[in-house]
Amino acid sequence: MRGSPGFCQTRRMLAATLAVLNFCILAVAQSKSRPPNEVAEHDPNLNSFQVFEFRRYSIKPGERQHFAKYFDTLFPEAFQQLGAVAAGSFLERGNETGFTWIRGFHTIDVRAVVHAAFYYGSVWNEHRDTLNNLITDSDNVLLLRPLSPERDVLILPAIDPVTEPNGAQGVVVAQIFAVKKDETEVFAREAEPAFARYRAAGAREAGVLVTLDVRNNFPQLPIRTDGPYLVWLGILHDNEILQREFIPVTEQVAGIFKASGHLRGAPELIVLDPTPRSRMRWLPSWK
């Protein structure tokens, strides 16, 4: 960073303040009332996130639950107040050290502002030593954008402690496709029949994301450069639906993906259990 430390800090604080003001103005302009204690399926205040990080951390053995509790307690509101969103946070099944979360930003420029405000701010400065001591790797990060406006990530309202006393429910699935260069769009079209079968098997599609091929404008946080990738996200009611309906369909359509000729390797299916305060979860109103 250029300039004196004091100047740089003032500039960061001003940029962060402007981002917060912009977010608050947007929220007031778009706000709509709803009955108290009712969890809405969609909140207009949470629109227009066009940049996402799909972050897969490795946590020290035996410490994942502790890390998840720190995350749920400290981070969701901290990001929201800066105009970003923790769209979902999860424990990876079949990987005892895997913690995955999705962070959204309105634009790529806002990403840099939010990161500077957060990682040079008071919340992270107070807790970074504790959290960094629990993380063994945090560099497995995909920088993504929605495939199209219609396939944007589903940003659900925050957990309501009154109507959802047991915390986030359901199962989230993420399927990651390593796509050949310049073939993402055609692969997405040819994969649509398979994705339609996922939805028919009980999955609520929560977004389709593809690699955002831009320069990392906050290089202090590395991102992967081995793309392109396509990530399909879905939410299931419970384990029974996952095992009885969804998993068999993924096995049946595997040949479609292989025969397409557009992939660099086999798709990776990740089964994710939401942390108690994860936004991305199965809503009580979804029957």
Task: Show which residues each predicted segment covers.
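Short, solvent-exposed loop/turn elements at beta->coil junctions and helix N-caps
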Residues: F90-L91, T211
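Short, low-order "capping/linker" segments at domain edges
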Residues: P222, R277-K287
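Surface-exposed interaction/gating patches
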Residues: F54-S58, H66, S148-P219, R224-N239, ...
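Short acidic/glycine-enriched loop/turn segments that link adjacent beta-strands
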Residues: G94-T97, R215
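Bacterial N-terminal signal peptides that target proteins for export
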Residues: M1-T17
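Bacterial N-terminal signal peptides
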Residues: A15-I25
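An amphipathic, aromatic/His-enriched active-site/gating alpha helix that lines ligand/cofactor pockets
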Residues: Q30-N47, K69-G88, N95, G104-L147, ...
